[in-house]
Amino acid sequence: MKRLLPSLRAKKRYLAFELISEVPVSRSDLVKEVMFSASSLLGDVTASECDIKVLGFEESKGIIQCAHTKVKETRASMATLTRINGKRATVHILGTSGTIKRATEKFLQNTAFEPEIRINPKRLKNNNLSRVQES
């Protein structure tokens, strides 16, 4: 059987997430609760159209695959997840990407804190430090 051309394949998005829970959670328990929350919020038809799959999960971080047209619905269903095996838990979506590699590099491999605002040291030295020294 021939393979589908890339233009005919279903497009996917990858959601990097962090699971915050009281106790450690296994991958199978997480998958079960993700599918349950999606089907209870969206209904069986829309949940199947979302094509949600938990691709990777280690410790408290992982990647979920979904259809590119159903990212908002997938994020909403993940937000409704509040308990896993009767213990309190929540899912924090770190970001969305078009490839697994980019999702991993950008959202899951945080090695150092970088502020969002870049500060020019010369500007800081001239304005703010002189005011502090005068006080």
Curated annotation (Swiss-Prot):
Localization annotation: Cytoplasm
Keyword check for Nuclease: yes
GO cellular component, one term: cytoplasm
Listed EC numbers: 3.1.26.5
PANTHER family assigned to the protein according to its UniProt record, in alphabetical order: RIBONUCLEASE P PROTEIN SUBUNIT P14, RIBONUCLEASE P_MRP PROTEIN SUBUNIT POP5
Family named by the database record: Belongs to the eukaryotic/archaeal RNase P protein component 2 family.
This protein's name: Ribonuclease P protein component 2
